[in-house]
């Protein structure tokens, strides 16, 4: 016990007295709870304990002492003494007491007459005794140096000596000092010492010091092994002694043995017996601490004896020794040996010696008992996790044993009971002897006498059974409170346990607190003498003040009392959990309920009546109140109903156990409203006393008349089934609470008597078919003859005719559906308002089917016969006519794909077969699926009619491959073959890992990727997770194991037999982390933290994370099996924070700690801590920012460092000048010297000087490089030479300039010629384009028109732009069949457009929750608080804000006027925020919820304008761009084209392309052949795309086939035809690259005949052409032409560099061609139609002007910017860049690039700043620079026209918005949007609640309560339901 043996301080007298224990019934073997059961005793929350203050010590701590009167804590550490304030542990004074030069073989230097020949080495001073002597105002501090020298320091100022000892000898009378006066404590760090200040004896006037010290002299393990015989310990330091401590008397007697002869006041083991009696002292204490008058006080010593087994002196290893002290003040002192007696202590269970805890660790005395911690030694003393136990002993038992022993020694000798300690020098004799006729007095029985043998040892130990067991216990402190015993236990891992024991000494609760992880708790703990609510304890490097209870963490009486905390109880009238002294009047009965009384004593209340009819009048409420409550009679009371509604309450008379109170019911006008869908409301009522609601109960208000509204289709049965006393009035067709309203009619009295429909099965009916439906009724006599209607929901009603008393006929019912089948509920309704239905408890339904829907092939169509659908296949699924024959057979099955393609021989593989006509029903294919000769059994639950079969393969005798066949009267065969193979495994790596799991293992073998399901099992039961596999390997993560052992590993295929392959994985002991260093880091992180431990060779990955303040975790590096290095994570602030390590993906946990804690605590326990400190700060020595340096001279930098506590080492500083390192030469706390050993480059005149520490980087100055005088001379010479060279160069220049002039003239002629060519090209291109576009316009008018997207798809793509591409790829699937009608468009399955997919059993609760949430969102106060609360969260990203805005838009789409008002309020907040900063930046981006809401609002309001005005010119512009691009060559791989608007997409080569008109027929299209124009440079894919465009120009793009889905065949002659492909065997290879085939490559002539057909086999030679590797393929130009340039001639090279820029003129050509279409588009956008003015734009622009005026913003530029940011840039630019939001078209990358140029021109037109253009400006801006001024005028004119429009009133705008809402109602599923919004509400629930609480309006309207109701409804089901959905 290294730390434990270092000595300890006993508790002060006040500490022991302040926490007395109440009497306990004696029990030698109290019942124990096993550890697993203890883990279930409550939640082990650290909340029951709280560290109030800490004081860290840089050196290990040794002892502490408390001065309660002065409020001071004295702390002794190695080489340091500290004086701390007890309240906050702040430092008041300190003293340095080491290290000093010393040798254990030398006398103390204070002994002047002694000399020493041995060398003295610098030695640390370990404190051994720290005791307070308040009577003399002293602090006694004894250390391990100088043979255990003691110092007397001043109480109140530890830094000052009170007495100088040995004293300075006066010249007249020198003081003789003996070694025994100096050798007080043990002189070795690990040797134990205890001390105790004893009160003065009579006549001496001074205190005394009792010392127990382990022998460290010759022969002990502590004596230096140098064969020296100089032992200063034996003679001078006895094991036990009482020394003089009279500092006011003769100093020559200080520390001398007190009595004379001195031998009688010491106890010293004989030299020869020391080996058999090695004493280790634990604690010394007084008992009683404050003895009553004339009572006998005792001093006790608790110690361990390492006696050999069988030695007669001491059989026990744990001992308790007792010494008598003088009675009363000034009593005569007893001789130590006279009264000394010792007895053994034994803590053992009932399991024999194996359950014996033999070593005493810690002792704490109470009033009648003392508690002790024992451990069972395992290996070395002080093992961290040694088994330990707590035992309790009674002082009365000690007293009885001592009296019996003395009687047995002196009166009736019994050698087996007691013996004389003959091993002691001061003993009287070897054995007890009978004193005849002696009568021992009580004092002699207790304390012995001089004439009796002494000292004595009792041979039979005092035994006790453990009351608690746990590993690693090191300390104990005990207090009694409220019929409980509170026991505090320190552990070796730095934790503090608090357990509560009841009167039977059984554990009833347990709490754990981590004080300092990894630092053992010192074995002495003490309560604050002045306030026992605090406990002081010490770990190896910290002093802590711990609050013994944190009662405030419990908020209810049940939690408070149920926690079974000895200190906590419920303060009834203050409704809080408190300590007893913190509760007013707690000393009076029933004001404070302790935990020992149990939860049954908590206040409770019953309300009578508990159910209230809303229509009845009640005089008042009776309240029955029970539980522990003071009498409420005479107190001011009220009944609190919430929302500030209270009524007067009164108690008629005094009572306690059950009190009756009376209370007025709240007024009817203040009844809470009934929730939607409920016939009742629950009201909570509380009794309020003195401002606190002390007890609460619920009662219910119900309304019978609401039952019919809540359950309209079961009104009568629900009324008579409800729990309320309701009656059904058949005459009024209403539920009533008072039957007197309708007594004339025969009213039903039970649900069975209600008139109701008796459901009968109906055959499915086809859509549109007319039929009569008979509806049977029961108990309907009252309604016979009444006018009824048959209702089928959704306003589908038909005439109902009475057939008889119990039968109604629905005439000529015609129902329609566009679905495959639809269920219509049938109900009977009484004609006339309001809606009144006959009950249908079991709804009757009609199934309507549509053969034309949902059956794309024959098998699916005919398979519907099983559902009763009369369908027949005839070129489609049709309704079978009455005369049509029964359906025949379908075509043979068509297998399109199978997966997987292989499986194991054992079978069991789930083979998926996809195709068409795969059977009408399961029975068709039940025995018809085969793999060769092996059957495959279809699975019923996985079968999809006609489309998919999932079957389980059978076993095969051997490996083979064959096709899969499906036989359904006809046989279908797969193209691929399925293979049976035999997988094998042969090795595993790594073969070992920690038992915590997480190791990634790789299994090697062959054919491991077979089958459909794979499992890797560890130990044949535990699955390996995260599997990835290839044909030869499987990688997975092993689970955790239980015991370190080898376990088999096998691979299971298809849940069949396991393939072992002799694979074994060894579970080894987990890696252990023992320490991290350093323990401090700069807040920026990056400091290298060294992690020490064991078994790191099994670690594959490790990361380090910091709790609470940490940033991202960092990844560590494993150096070897014992060391890991980690960069410290960055932190958010300066603080101490817990650190976690994740080893192999598993959180590291100390196994010993996990045994101690319950599972919840083990997960939260912080293992290690990092102290984050501010980043270090540096500066140059003189704090200058510029340092001048001459190159070539030596450079040394002196850097000043601000003082910090990081303790950085020299290797952690990295100093650089530019990129050159500065080597550190000298480093101290304040200054760093570094020098540069290499020359600094002069390319740069200035170099930064930077210092890096971890991730922190600071530039402290700049080094300016200056030249010397030599450099100046060299510079002058160089300048002269340069001047001469300049003259020569001027002459050469003049000569060449004349040549350049001639060349320039020639170039001008070429440019004029080029300009002429460009003009001609533009003219011709424009004419051709106009012709083509005219034809296109005519086509549009003839065909279906522009392919606009439906409104709902426009909204989803605009609102959720990030997902639009996913929708296009995932949901819009191209059809492979093309007909002239184009087919029905495929549906985008966006979640907002479909059903709310949740399981039916969850639907009622969730729909109710969503309904309530919808009502909240329709509350303006809630919604605005909700939005602001979310936007204030740092992790609520921009993407989340935009998503929330769009979801709100969908949810409120039906109330656009309300949505607009919300948007305006949020905009006002945004304007206020922007106006305070820079108003011109408002609405510049979309970073807030309201900005995205504005975008969506504009999209909704401008959709009509977009479709009716802008759509056509925009579509024509897109067509024109595509036509123009297609007129020239387009490189299929790079995408660059001859004609474009974007420079980056310009093909800078003069590649001549000749047009080819091709006659093409398209098989299966139903159209004649067409003439298609293509270029001879086009690839075959480009030709296919142009052909598809020609045939499908009147069909939306989503329904086009793709180029890879069709084959193109050229009929060269009547006998020859070729399938044309981009790549084939004829492809040309140039420079190692294949060139894509073109029309010119195949030499296809003008007018050639081609045929195109759909194919199921895609061209596998290449995918998307753009994705091809440019290193292998090219089309028109070689991408790496520039790389071969050096090989060409200079002339060719020059041409390459210059000529490409000439092709920029083609941009002008393309621009000129498209100019008319662009002008038309901009005109449509920026003009106002008189018949349809833009009302939304006018309304919003007026709103902006109004807000600007309110804030005094008169700058017209600001308003212009606001308007531009609101409409043109926010809406129109988005549309211009994303035409796929509006049209069903293809947006190619090239068209996208051109649209970017056009959008930029539009942006520039809306800007008010002048364009700063020059020769270096991008061409995208230069292209339209000339048109921008005219466009700007158009924009300003548009804004002016809007301003001049007649202002709109709020009513007009609301009407317009309501019309927009109505126009597109029911387009979206708002429930889905609500559910998505709720996810945000759930995620930020605490913040939203806090915001609602802080908002007065929300608080007044109880919005937070309603929000909690939403959460309660949703949280019951939402995750379960979503997981099932």
UniProtKB/Swiss-Prot annotation:
The UniProt record lists the keyword Flavoprotein: no
Record domain Sema: where: 49-548
Tissue specificity annotation: Detected in embryonic heart and vascular endothelium, brain, dorsal root ganglia, adrenal gland, lung mesenchyme, small intestine and in the ossification centers of vertebral bodies.
CDD domains attached to this UniProt entry: IPT_plexin_repeat1, IPT_plexin_repeat2, IPT_plexin_repeat3, RasGAP_plexin_D1, Sema_plexin_D1
Alphabetized UniProt keyword annotations: Angiogenesis, Cell membrane, Cell projection, Developmental protein, Disulfide bond, Glycoprotein, Membrane, Receptor, Repeat, Signal, Transmembrane, Transmembrane helix
Region (Disordered): 1-26
Extracellular side, ranges: 49-1271
Domain of life: Eukaryota
MF (Gene Ontology): protein domain specific binding; semaphorin receptor activity
Topology versus the membrane: Single-pass membrane protein
Glycan-carrying positions: 157, 226, 483, 967, 1120
Location within or outside the cell: Cell membrane; Cell projection, Lamellipodium membrane
Disulfide bonds: 106-116, 142-150, 324-447, 347-391, 551-568, 557-602, 560-577, 571-583, 639-663
Spans within the Cytoplasmic topological domain: 1293-1925
Oligomer and partners: Interacts with NRP1 and SEMA4A. Interacts with SH3BP1; they dissociate upon SEMA3E binding to PLXND1 allowing SH3BP1 to transduce downstream signal through RAC1 inactivation.
Its job: Cell surface receptor for SEMA4A and for class 3 semaphorins, such as SEMA3A, SEMA3C and SEMA3E. Plays an important role in cell-cell signaling, and in regulating the migration of a wide spectrum of cell types. Regulates the migration of thymocytes in the medulla. Regulates endothelial cell migration. Plays an important role in ensuring the specificity of synapse formation. Mediates anti-angiogenic signaling in response to SEMA3E. Required for normal development of the heart and vasculature.
Name of the protein described by the UniProt record: Plexin-D1
Species the sequence originates in: Mus musculus
Gene: Plxnd1
């Amino acid at each position: 016990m290294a730390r434990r043996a270092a000595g300890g301080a006993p508790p002060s007298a006040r500490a022991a007295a302040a926490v007395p224990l109440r009497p306990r019934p004696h029990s030698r073997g109290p019942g124990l709870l096993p550890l697993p059961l203890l883990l279930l005793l409550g939640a082990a929350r650290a909340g029951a304990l709280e560290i109030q203050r800490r004081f860290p010590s840089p050196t290990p701590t040794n002892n502490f002492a408390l001065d309660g009167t002065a409020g001071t804590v004295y702390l002794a550490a190695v080489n340091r003494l500290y004086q701390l304030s007890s309240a906050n542990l702040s430092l008041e004074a300190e003293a340095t007491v080491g290290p000093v030069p010393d040798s254990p073989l030398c006398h103390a230097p204070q002994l002047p007459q002694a000399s020493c020949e041995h060398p003295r080495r610098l030695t640390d001073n370990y404190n051994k005794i720290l005791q307070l002597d308040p009577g003399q105002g002293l602090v006694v501090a004894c250390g391990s140096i100088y043979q255990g020298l003691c110092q007397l320091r001043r109480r109140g100022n530890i830094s000052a000596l009170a007495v100088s000892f040995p004293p300075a000898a006066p010249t007249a009378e020198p003081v003789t000092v003996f070694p025994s006066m100096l050798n007080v404590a043990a002189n070795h760090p690990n040797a134990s010492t205890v001390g105790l200040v004893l009160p003065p004896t009579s006549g001496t006037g001074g205190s005394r010091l009792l010392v127990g010290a382990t022998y460290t002299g010759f022969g002990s393990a502590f004596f230096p092994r140098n064969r020296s015989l100089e032992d200063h310990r034996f003679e001078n330091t006895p094991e036990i002694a009482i020394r003089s401590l009279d500092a006011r008397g003769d100093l020559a007697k200080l520390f001398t043995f007190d009595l004379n002869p001195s031998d009688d006041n010491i106890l010293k083991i004989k030299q020869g017996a020391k080996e058999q009696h090695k004493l280790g002292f634990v604690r010394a204490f007084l008992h009683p601490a404050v003895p009553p008058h004339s009572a006998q006080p005792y001093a006790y010593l608790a110690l361990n004896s390492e006696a050999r087994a069988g030695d007669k002196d001491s059989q026990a290893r744990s001992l308790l020794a007792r010494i008598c002290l003088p009675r009363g003040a000034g009593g005569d002192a007893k001789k130590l040996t006279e009264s000394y007696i010792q007895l053994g202590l034994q803590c053992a269970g009932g399991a024999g010696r194996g359950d014996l805890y033999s070593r005493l660790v810690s002792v704490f005395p109470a009033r009648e008992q003392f508690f002790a911690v024992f451990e069972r030694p395992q290996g070395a003393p002080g093992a961290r996790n040694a088994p330990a136990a707590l035992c309790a002993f009674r002082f009365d038992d000690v007293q009885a044993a001592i009296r019996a022993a003395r009687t047995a020694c002196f009166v009736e000798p019994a050698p087996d009971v007691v013996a004389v300690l003959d091993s002691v020098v001061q003993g009287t004799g070897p054995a007890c002897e009978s004193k005849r006729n002696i009568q021992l007095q009580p004092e002699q029985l207790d304390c012995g006498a001089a004439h009796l043998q002494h000292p004595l040892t009792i041979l039979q130990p005092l035994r006790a059974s453990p009351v608690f067991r746990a590993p690693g216990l090191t300390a104990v402190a005990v207090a009694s409170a409220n019929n409980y015993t509170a026991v505090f236990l320190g552990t070796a891992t730095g934790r503090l346990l608090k357990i509560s024991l009841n009167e039977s000494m059984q554990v009833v609760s347990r709490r754990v607190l981590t004080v300092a992880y990894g630092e053992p708790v010192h074995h002495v703990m003490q309560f604050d003498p002045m306030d026992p609510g605090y406990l002081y304890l010490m770990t190896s490097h910290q002093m802590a003040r711990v609050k013994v209870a944190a009662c405030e963490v419990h908020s209810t009486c049940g939690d408070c009392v149920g926690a079974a905390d000895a200190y906590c109880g419920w303060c009834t009238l203050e409704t809080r959990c408190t300590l007893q002294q913190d509760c007013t009047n707690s000393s009076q009965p029933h004001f404070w309920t302790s935990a020992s009384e149990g939860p049954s004593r908590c206040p409770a209340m019953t309300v009578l009546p508990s159910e209230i009819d809303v229509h009845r009048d009640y005089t008042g409420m009776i309240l029955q109140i029970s539980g522990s409550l003071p009498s409420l009679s005479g107190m001011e009371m009220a009944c609190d109903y919430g929302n500030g509604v209270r009524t007067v309450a009164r108690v008629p008379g005094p009572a306690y156990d059950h009190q009756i109170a009376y209370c007025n019911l709240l007024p009817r006008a203040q009844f809470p409203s009934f929730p939607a869908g409920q016939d009742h409301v629950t009201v909570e009522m509380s009794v309020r006393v003195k401002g606190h609601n002390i007890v609460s109960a619920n009662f219910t208000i119900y309304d019978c008349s609401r039952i019919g509204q809540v359950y309209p289709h079961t009104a009568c049965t629900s009324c008579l089934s409800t729990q309320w006393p309701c009656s059904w009035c058949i005459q009024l067709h209403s539920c009533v609470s008072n039957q007197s309203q309708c007594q004339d009619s025969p009213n039903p009295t039970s649900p069975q008597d209600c008139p109701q429909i008796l459901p009968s099965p109906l055959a499915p009916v086809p859509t549109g078919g007319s039929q009569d439906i008979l509806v049977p009724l029961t108990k309907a006599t009252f309604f016979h003859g009444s006018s009824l209607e048959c209702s089928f929901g959704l306003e589908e009603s038909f005439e109902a005719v009475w057939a008889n008393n119990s039968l109604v006929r629905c005439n000529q019912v015609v129902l329609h559906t566009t679905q495959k089948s639809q269920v219509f509920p049938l109900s009977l309704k009484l004609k006339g308002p309001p809606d009144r239905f006959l009950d249908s408890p079991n709804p009757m339904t009609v199934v309507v089917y549509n053969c034309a829907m949902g059956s794309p092939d024959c098998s699916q169509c005919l398979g519907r016969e099983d559902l009763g659908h009369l369908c027949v296949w005839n070129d489609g699924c049709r309704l079978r006519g009455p005369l049509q024959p029964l359906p025949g057979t379908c075509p043979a099955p068509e297998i399109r794909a199978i997966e997987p393609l292989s499986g194991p021989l054992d079978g069991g593989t789930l083979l998926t077969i996809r195709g068409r006509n795969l059977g009408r029903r399961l029975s068709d294919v039940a025995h018809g699926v085969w793999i060769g000769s092996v059957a495959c059994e279809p699975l019923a639950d996985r079968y999809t009619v006609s489309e998919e079969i999932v079957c389980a393969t059978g076993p095969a005798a051997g490996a083979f491959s064959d096709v899969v066949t499906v036989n359904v009267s006809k046989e279908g065969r797969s193209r691929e073959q399925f293979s049976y193979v035999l997988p094998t495994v042969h090795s595993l790596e790594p073969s070992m890992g920690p038992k915590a799991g997480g190791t990634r293992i790789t299994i090697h073998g062959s054919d491991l990727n077979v089958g459909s399901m794979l499992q890797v099992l560890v130990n044949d039961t535990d699955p390996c997770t995260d599997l990835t596999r290839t044909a030869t390997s499987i990688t997975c993560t092993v689970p955790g194991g239980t015991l370190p052992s080898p376990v088999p590993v096998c691979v299971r295929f298809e849940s069949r037999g396991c393939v072992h392959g002799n694979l074994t994985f060894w579970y080894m002991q987990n890696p252990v982390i023992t320490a991290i260093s350093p323990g401090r880091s700069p807040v920026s992180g990056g400091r290298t933290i060294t992690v020490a431990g064991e078994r790191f060779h099994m670690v594959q990955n490790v990361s380090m994370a910091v709790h609470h303040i940490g940033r991202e975790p960092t990844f560590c590096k494993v150096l070897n099996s014992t060391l890991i290095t980690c960069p410290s994570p960055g932190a958010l602030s300066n603080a101490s924070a817990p650190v976690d390590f994740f080893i192999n993906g598993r959180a590291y946990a100390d196994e010993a700690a996990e045994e101690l804690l319950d599972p919840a605590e083990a997960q939260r326990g912080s293992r290690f801590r990092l102290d984050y400190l501010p980043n270090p700060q540096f500066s140059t020595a003189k704090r200058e920012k510029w340092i001048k340096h001459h190159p070539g001279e030596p450079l040394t930098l002196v850097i000043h460092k601000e003082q910090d506590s990081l303790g950085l080492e020299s290797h952690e500083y990295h100093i650089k000048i530019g990129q050159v390192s500065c080597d550190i030469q000298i480093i101290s706390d304040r200054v760093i010297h570094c020098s540069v050993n290499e020359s600094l480059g002069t390319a740069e005149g200035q170099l930064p000087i930077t210092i890096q520490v971890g991730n922190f980087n600071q530039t402290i100055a700049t080094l300016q490089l200056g030249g010397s005088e030599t450099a100046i001379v060299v510079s002058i010479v160089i300048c002269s030479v340069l001047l001469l060279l300049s003259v020569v160069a001027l002459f050469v220049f003049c000569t060449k300039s004349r040549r350049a002039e001639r060349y320039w003239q020639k170039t001008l002629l070429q440019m004029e010629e080029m300009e002429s060519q460009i003009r001609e090209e533009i003219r011709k291109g424009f004419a051709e384009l106009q012709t083509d576009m005219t034809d296109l316009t005519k086509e549009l008018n003839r065909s279906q028109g522009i392919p606009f997207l439906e409104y709902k798809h426009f909204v989803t793509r605009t609102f959720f732009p990030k997902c639009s591409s996913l929708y296009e790829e995932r949901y819009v699937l191209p059809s492979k069949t093309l007909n002239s009608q184009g087919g029905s468009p495929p549906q985008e399955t966006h979640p907002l457009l479909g059903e709310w997919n949740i399981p039916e059993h969850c639907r009622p609760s969730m729909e109710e929750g969503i309904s309530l949430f919808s009502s909240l969102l329709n509350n303006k106060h809630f919604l605005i608080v909700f939005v602001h609360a979310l936007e204030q969260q740092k992790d609520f990203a921009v993407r989340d804000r935009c998503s929330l805005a769009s979801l709100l838009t969908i949810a409120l789409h039906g109330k656009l006027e309300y949505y607009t008002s919300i948007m305006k309020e949020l905009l006002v907040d945004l304007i206020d925020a922007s106006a305070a900063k820079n108003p011109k930046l408002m609405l510049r981006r979309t970073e807030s919820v309201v900005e995205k809401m504005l975008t969506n609002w504009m999209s909704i309001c401008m959709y009509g304008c977009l479709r009716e005005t802008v759509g056509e010119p925009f579509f024509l512009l897109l067509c024109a761009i595509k036509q123009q691009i297609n007129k020239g060559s387009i490189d299929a791989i790079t995408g660059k084209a001859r004609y474009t608007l974007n420079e980056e997409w310009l093909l800078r080569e003069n590649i001549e392309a000749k047009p080819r008109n091709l006659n093409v027929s398209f098989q299966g299209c139903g159209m004649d052949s067409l003439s298609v124009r293509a270029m001879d440079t086009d690839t075959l894919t480009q030709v296919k795309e142009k052909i598809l465009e020609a045939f499908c120009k009147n069909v939306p793009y989503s329904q086009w086939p793709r180029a890879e889905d069709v084959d193109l065949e050229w009929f060269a002659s009547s006998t020859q035809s070729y399938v044309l492909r981009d790549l084939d065997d004829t492809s040309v290879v140039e420079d190692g690259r294949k060139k894509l085939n073109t029309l010119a490559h195949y030499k296809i002539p003008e007018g050639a005949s081609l045929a195109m057909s759909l194919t199921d086999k895609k061209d596998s030679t290449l995918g998307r052409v753009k994705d091809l590797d440019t290193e292998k393929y090219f089309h028109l130009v070689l991408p790496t032409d520039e790389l071969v340039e050096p090989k060409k001639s200079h002339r060719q090279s020059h041409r390459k560099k210059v000529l490409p820029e000439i092709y920029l003129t083609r941009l002008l050509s393309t621009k000129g061609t498209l100019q008319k279409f662009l002008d038309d588009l901009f005109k449509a956008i920026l003009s106002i139609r008189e018949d349809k003015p833009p009302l939304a734009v006018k309304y919003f622009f007026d709103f902006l002007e109004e807000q600007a005026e309110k804030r005094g913003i008169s700058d017209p530029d600001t308003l212009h910017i606001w308007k531009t940011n609101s409409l043109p840039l926010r809406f129109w630019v988005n549309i211009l860049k994303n035409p796929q939001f509006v049209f069903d078209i293809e947006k190619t990358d090239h068209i996208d690039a051109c649209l970017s140029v056009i959008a930029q021109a539009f942006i520039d037109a809306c800007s008010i700043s002048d364009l700063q253009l020059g020769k270096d400006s991008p061409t995208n801006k230069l292209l339209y620079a000339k048109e921008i001024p005219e466009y700007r005028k158009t924009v300003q004119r548009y804004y002016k026209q809007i301003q001049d429009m007649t202002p709109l009133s709020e009513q007009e705008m609301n009407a317009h918005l309501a019309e927009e809402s109505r126009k597109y109602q029911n387009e979206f599923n708002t429930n889905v949007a609500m559910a998505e919004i709720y996810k945000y509400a759930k995620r930020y629930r605490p913040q939203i609640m806090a915001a609602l609480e802080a908002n007065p309006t929300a608080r007044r309207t109880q919005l937070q309560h309603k929000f909690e109701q939403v959460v309660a409804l949703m949280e019951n089901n939402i995750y379960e339901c979503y997981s099932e959905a």
